[in-house]
């Protein structure tokens, strides 16, 4: 039998990225936190679903806080110190995710709301009658 050399998978190298951008997408059902460098390369990401929450609990502020802490911990390992925060969406986890990033040890230099607003584009879904 021929011997085969064992090939290990390509592991992400540790980069020293001192400052970056945190994108927080907060919907009513989930919160996604992506941390990128200034050119847009994703360094770490996390979401409420990836943090172990399922169903309706993904939309809670605590789930957003947990997701932000996990993403921040991975970014700190890459050497990140200063961040700009771009928040998108109407969800309940916006403020708690920002607070969790601050508590994790990242210095926030800018917070910007980039929620897309239509200039009367598509028709809205009909109102729920409960």
Swiss-Prot record:
Gene: rpsK
Record PROSITE patterns: RIBOSOMAL_S11 (PS00054)
Annotated keywords: Ribonucleoprotein, Ribosomal protein, RNA-binding, rRNA-binding
Single annotated GO MF: rRNA binding
Function of the molecule: Located on the platform of the 30S subunit, it bridges several disparate RNA helices of the 16S rRNA. Forms part of the Shine-Dalgarno cleft in the 70S ribosome.
Pfam entry (one): Ribosomal_S11
Biological process per Gene Ontology, one example term: translation
Family: Belongs to the universal ribosomal protein uS11 family.
Superkingdom classification of source: Bacteria
Gene Ontology CC annotation, any one: ribosome
InterPro entries assigned: Ribosomal_uS11, Ribosomal_uS11_bac-type, Ribosomal_uS11_CS, Ribosomal_uS11_sf
Protein name, UniProt field: Small ribosomal subunit protein uS11
Complexes and interactors: Part of the 30S ribosomal subunit. Interacts with proteins S7 and S18. Binds to IF-3.
């Amino acid at each position: 039998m021929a011997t085969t050399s064992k090939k290990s998978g390509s592991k992400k190298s540790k980069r020293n990225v001192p400052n970056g951008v945190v994108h927080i997408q907060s919907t009513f059902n989930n919160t996604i936190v992506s941390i990128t460098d200034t050119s847009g390369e994703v360094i770490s990401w996390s979401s409420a679903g990836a943090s172990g929450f399922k169903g309706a609990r993904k939309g809670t502020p605590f789930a957003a806080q947990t997701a932000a802490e996990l993403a921040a911990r991975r970014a700190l390992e890459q050497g990140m110190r200063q961040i700009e925060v771009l928040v998108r969406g109407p969800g309940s986890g916006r403020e708690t995710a920002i607070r969790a990033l601050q508590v994790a040890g990242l210095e926030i230099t800018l917070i910007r709301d980039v929620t897309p607003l239509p200039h009367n584009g598509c028709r809205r879904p009909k109102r729920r009658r409960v």
